[in-house]
Amino acid sequence: MPDAPVGPRPHAFATALPPAVLSLVLGLWGVRRGGALWRDEAVSYDMAHRSLPDLWATLGQADAVHGLYYLLLHGLFGVFGGADPLLVLRLPSVLATAVASGTLALLGRRLAGARAGLLAGVVFALLPPVQRYAQEGRSYAVVCMLVVWASYLLVRAVETRSRRVWAGYAAVMVAACLLHEFAVLAVVAHLFALPRSARRTGLRVAAVVCGCLAPLAVVSMGQSEQVAWIGGVGGDLVGFSAVTVLGLVCAVLLRRDPPARRGPLPGFAPALLVLPAFLLLLSTPFKPLFVDRYVLYGHAGAALLVGAVLDRSLRARGRIRAVAVLATGAALLVLLPVGVGLRTPQSRADDVTAVAEAVRAAGSDGDGVLYMPARRRVWSLVDPGSVRGLRDLALERGPAASHTLYGTEVPAAGIRVRMLATARIVVLRDPVSQPLDGTAQERVKRRVLAAYFVECGTRRVQGARISVYARPGRC
């Protein structure tokens, strides 16, 4: 990789600190989201609170791809169990995003100069997807941090040819891949961006990373039903495409500069932005796998490119500089309401806390409860007290006892018998717009409710319907 543009180079600390502090402030702003929790975070919470033997047994059947993250959360809750559970759940992501923003600034500093790096870190911290996952109790922000850190080490390894730095790169990438195996796509992007002189070493290191990932990949391939919910490209792709187009436009602008001036960034950043997402999209005709959070680290590539263009514009004089300042101000005005919206319960697919409150208000001791579909039992994992006194009419074994995410259910005939022996049932369902599951258990739930019960009332909360059904005349 060629040298970055030559110029005054402030201390690295001065470059990294402002983006890191900005990211930390944004991450702490509204981090509790009004006490709301959505279903993926509920899974994280439940898995983190299982015993280590139960957790290990569950990972053998489901969610092995997130196993290391659940183990991390298990340790944190063991140490800080008396603290606010939402903070314990989300602070790792807040801190990881702050570290990623600061590290990205250092990476940009090496690739394009100090101011370009600082601006890249600030842009990264402000991107809506980055703000979103900075406040989620899932692994994606931590994976993003590790990929950004590995990218920094990769640039240093190429510059110094140090085996120790190459080993550090390999170790960090292995950690990222063990937290989420799609981080391995960043290795492909890194290989693509390497200069020819470093590719042989890069290939050897990539082989080590893939070898360490292989056991997890084999296990998770046997759990492919975990991603069966991905129905194809949709809204996720629209948002990611907008960021990608912005980044690629910036890359084109940067390539207009002579090589000695533009530095290595226009060759490095587009690969990180485009390749991982493109490789996921290639699988769509056979098995849809693209979800924007799986390649959240690609936004680091976009931020590097935008930061470099902003730096280039600020070096210019007259109209170009004025346009850059106005465009930046307009972008900040647009991002403010987006940021506010991300910190509301309505920003997520559902609200487990609101569901629990609605169930507690609707149910009475002795009532039955049905989850339609069965995986919506996740809504009761965090607050089992909301269904205490209610009889789960379909349940065979609970999530922890069955070493599954949502528990196992009795056969359809057993569900029918239990429903017919119950006078009043609280039903937890998806919104009307969601497709219906076609399993025998789900079909019999719908048929018995339609034939033998009447709907007494329905309360709608974010991402869910809580209905009360009773025998005719018993509402």
Regions found by a protein language model. Give the residues of each.
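Terminal, non-globular segments
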Residues: 2-475
